[in-house]
Structure formats: structure tokens, C-alpha cells
Amino acid sequence: MDNLKRVIIPAAKIVPAELQKLGKLPGIIYPINQKIAFDYLYEEYKEYCTSMDIICFEQAGKVQRRLNPYLSEQVRIKILPELGDLGQTIYFALGQIKESLIINFSDTIVMDNIAKIDGDAFFCQEDYMSDTWTYFDEQDGVITRVYDKKPAKTDKKKKLFVGVFQIEDPVYFKTCLEKAFQEVRPQMSTFYHALQIYSRQHPMKAISTENWFDIGHEDKYYNSKLEVRAREFNHISIDKNRGILRKTSDDKDKFIGEIKWYLKLPSDVEYVRPRIFDYSTSYVNPYVSMEYYAYHTVHELFLYGDLTLQQWVDVFNRIRFVCDDFKRYTVKDGSIQHALEEMYLTKTLQRFERMKKENIFSTFFEEPIEVNGEKYLPLNDISAVLEKVIPKMLYEVDTFNIIHGDLCFANIMVD
């Protein structure tokens, strides 16, 4: 592809305190719906750039470990010698860059790709002024005034910088940063001051976007999780004003079973599920409308978080409590083995058959599986063992209690 860009992602600071439930993480490795921010940025730019430079300082080691599979000629981590403001971070990153440049803040995901736009440009949005964002005035592409996180003095909406910029002349932009360092303005980041200077020589297109997902502020982060989740799962729609999730599924038998499981829970263990507002178990069009939770899943905590040992003990104690609480409700029946075999054997083998059809799992069925240096049987061999062992284990069982049939990390949310 012609006209490939360079991408700079400033990621020098950790997320604010209100987002540190997962630990003190930089925005670039903060999770949003089973991925981290960089996963989205990489997918967006990988076909449009020669390199992506991630500029780190706080918790740089965590970024290096988490992004290690990505590191290559195209993806590089650079560590600041000392922490300065945003302008100093960008200045350090610029080095001798001469080709067209994209600057994308590490906590900003915009689904519109600025690399597809010609010329100097940046994304913006309109909102009422607050001390959360950096706003601006512009005329004919020239930024005439910047309001850098200033309290509101007007009830009118103004344009704000989203956090994605395209610079066609990075050599001159570096000169603009040097001027901004000399003309210190306490109320404005040197980056925005330099951008203002740059726009006088190179007018910039201010492009409005509605596809902006911000993970650097608590309120916007949870709103972004809502919208990104709805985009990624075409059977989910979310009413963010009411906090209601509506779900459908092509796998109707499994989905109807899930709905019935929700509905049949005894009232004093309903705390484990969202409130249900509407549903249908009709085979024609099954659906459920339920309360949407924006909590992190245990999957996110395990893969992307930085929890202490005690925090993990607390998480598993809560899971154990739920499992023990379920044991209060039992069914005793001498002919229960068929239902148990359906749950523990048939369901497992059905899942294996689905996996076998997916290319990424197919080799696991024929070849030994190696995990952390230990080798295990191929899944075909494990299936054969299960078919013999599980029925024998169930012969003497005549009591069954409530269980969750898919209690995996991705299905457990922790507040």
C-alpha cells in the first residue's frame, strides 16, 4: 500500500485512580470487552503503517510483557528517560521521523480510520465544556484558541479533541514543539500549543466522529464497553440509557435452555443473575431483555489485570460461596443418572465436536497438547476416556443440586 504512515501511541501514564480496580495499568493494555486497547489500535493501523511506536514510562515493564507477542519491526516500545507532559512525550517519539504521522492517544479508540483521510487532520466531537476535555476554536483549518481542561464558562457546546491526529509534516511539527517549550503557557499542554502553531502553517481538517470510544475516564469507559460490546456481538443490542441488554441467538436450543435456567432459579439465589425485564422461549424468535452489568469478568481480571494474591483469594471465595449456596437446593432421584450424563458427558462431547470444526482447534484433537512444558493427551483420546469414566462415576449418584452449566471465567462478573 502506498503512503504508509508512522504511528505514535503515547502511553506514558497509568489510568486514573477510579479505573484502577484492575490494578495500576497504562491505558494501552487496559481491557475493553475481552481485548486490550492496543488490540483495537493494531487492527486499525496494521495495514496502513510502517511502524507503531508505543511510548511508555509508568509500568513500562507490564506493557512490555503484555505486548511481547506483538513486538516486531512494525511494533516497538520506547521508554521515556523521564516523565514530562504530553508534548515532551511526543517530542521524544518523533526522533528523525519525516513521513506522514498519526498520533493516537493510548486510551482512545476511533472506529473511523484517520489513515484513510488525506492531509493534516484530527478527529473531534462536540460537547458542553467541562474540565475533563480539551476544547478548541478554529477557522479555515487554523486552531485559533485552545481551552485545555478549563471549567465551563458557557452553556454552549464546543468542539473537543478526541485524541487522534494526522501530521503530514512531522519535521515542522517538531519545530513547533520546540517553540511551545520556549513559550511556556501554564494553562495549556505544550502539545496543544504546538498543534495550534502548526495549524497556522498547515491548516488541519477538524473531522467530527461519533465512533469514539474513550477508556481514560470512568463514565466514558463503561459507556464505551457497552457500545463496543454491541458492535462485536451481532446478537446483542444495548439500550445504554436504560442499561438494558437484549440478546438473541442462532443456537436456539442452547439459548432457550439458558433463559429457562434464569427463570427457574429460586428467588433467594437470583442475586447471581441480572434482572430480567422481558423474554420469549418461543422457538420462532427466542430473546431475553435483561439488566446490563458493566463489571469486569474474571477472564479480564486474569488475563489483563494486576490483582494481588489476596484479591484473588477474595474472588475465589465469592465463587465458592455461590457454589455452596446452590447446594441448598437438591433433587434426590434414583433415576437421575441420565440427566447427569447429559450434563457432564453429552454436553462436553458436543462442545468438542464444535471445536473440531474450527481450524484453530483442529490440531488439538490429533496431537498432544503442551501447556507450560507439560504434555497432555490429544482431545480425541480424552473424549474416549471420558466416555468410559464419567458413566462409572455417576452410578452411585442419586442427588443433584443447582449448578451453572458453563461456569468459566468469561461468564463470571465481579464488582
Regions found by a protein language model. Name each.
Residues 1-25:
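N-terminal nucleotide-binding beta1-loop-alpha1 segment
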Residues 3-8, 158-240:
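Conserved alpha/beta core of the MobA/IspD/sugar-nucleotide pyrophosphorylase nucleotidyltransferase superfamily
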Residues 63-64, 71-138:
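Conserved beta-loop-beta/alpha segment of the NTase-like Rossmann-fold superfamily
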Residues 109-185:
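Conserved core of the sugar-phosphate nucleotidyltransferase
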Residues 233-264, 298-307:
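ATP-binding glycine-rich loop module of kinase domains
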Residues 275-286:
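Short beta-strand micro-motifs within the conserved protein kinase catalytic domain, predominantly
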Residues 299-358, 382-403:
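Conserved kinase catalytic-core helix
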Residues 408-415:
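Catalytic activation segment of kinase domains across protein kinase-like and atypical kinase folds
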